[in-house]
């Protein structure tokens, strides 16, 4: 187990921020045609290539 480099840490932070659900106002605005975010990622099912 080594230290994370700054580049890897920034990429992990970006992936962490992207891994959110779609905002509720989008669901309301599109009359529930948009439910989730296509970029959602589960920590166990699909791994990042960092």
From Swiss-Prot:
Source taxon at top rank: Archaea
Keyword set, alphabetical order: Ribonucleoprotein, Ribosomal protein
A Pfam family the protein falls into: Ribosomal_L39
Entries under Gene3D superfamilies matching the protein: Ribosomal protein L39e
Any one GO CC term of the record: ribosome
Biological process according to GO: translation
InterPro entries: Ribosomal_eL39, Ribosomal_eL39_CS, Ribosomal_eL39_dom_sf
Record family assignment: Belongs to the eukaryotic ribosomal protein eL39 family.
Protein name (database record): Large ribosomal subunit protein eL39
Biological source species: Archaeoglobus fulgidus (strain ATCC 49558 / DSM 4304 / JCM 9628 / NBRC 100126 / VC-16)
Lineage: Archaea, Methanobacteriati, Methanobacteriota, Archaeoglobi, Archaeoglobales
């Amino acid at each position: 187990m080594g230290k994370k480099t700054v580049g890897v840490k920034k990429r992990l932070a970006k992936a962490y921020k992207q891994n959110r659900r779609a905002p509720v106002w989008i669901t309301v605005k599109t009359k529930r045609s948009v439910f989730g975010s296509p970029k959602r990622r589960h920590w166990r099912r699909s791994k990042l290539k960092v």
